[in-house]
Amino acid sequence: YRRQRQMCIRDSAKTLRMIGQMHKAISVIQFKLEAEIIRRRPDFEMDDRMLLHRIDFERKTITMPNGKEYELKDSFLPTVNPADPYKLTDEEREIMNKLHRSFVSSEKLKKHIRCLFRYGCMYTVSNSNLLFHASIPLNADGTLKDVSIAGKMYKGKALLEKVGHLIRTAFFAEEDNEDRPFAVDYVWYLWCGKDSPAFDKDKMATFERYFLKEKELHKEVKGHYYS
């Protein structure tokens, strides 16, 4: 029993180490792919979320957008080329191609998503109650905040309806629909963008939480809706 227990402990440590390595590898892929969207959509105003090029691998530090240099908890990122930090390696691209095929070929997943997007909504009114997910972007004085989407301003109900339209365009529109590429990118912004009604924070501090020990950098400042 003692020997079996020791083997289990060793196997658990090995498994945890492998999970950690996989987590780090897929996180780096995430940062690289997010950079592609950020570069493609300057109107998202998310340049501060591109951080890989700020790493000094020799010093094992990173200079953050606030101008300060911080020591990395882990600087071993073998898939990041300092000369071109956001370029996927061949192996990373192969992983993403396989993941993409798995998602688009899953009929059960398509069925669930199709149901959500066909019948779901960014908001609804039930028993005279307004129901919505997360927040409504507000100004400091509590008034509805104007949010820019593709060069036009939206707020309140109009914002939620525009977001709902973009979500459906991303999923239901044909590949050659000229509005689809922006809609697809906006679905990502909806998840982590500062003016997204589904997020409404100044940033998603994924990199900071994984690689920096300073707690103040982990903080995600919520919008005025939460004040």
What are these regions (language model features)?
Residues 221-227:
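C-terminal, well-structured subdomains that either form a transmembrane helix-short loop-helix hairpin
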Residues 10-17:
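A conserved mid-domain beta-alpha-beta active-site/ligand-binding segment of alpha/beta enzyme cores
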Residues 8, 101-104, 226:
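Catalytic cores of large soluble enzymes that bind and process phosphate-bearing ligands
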Residues 28-31, 35-96, 100-211:
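Extended, H/D-rich, highly charged conserved domains that either
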Residues 215-221:
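Short glycine/proline- and acidic residue-enriched helix-loop micro-motifs
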Residues 1-9:
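Single conserved hydrophobic/aromatic residue that forms the stacking wall/gate
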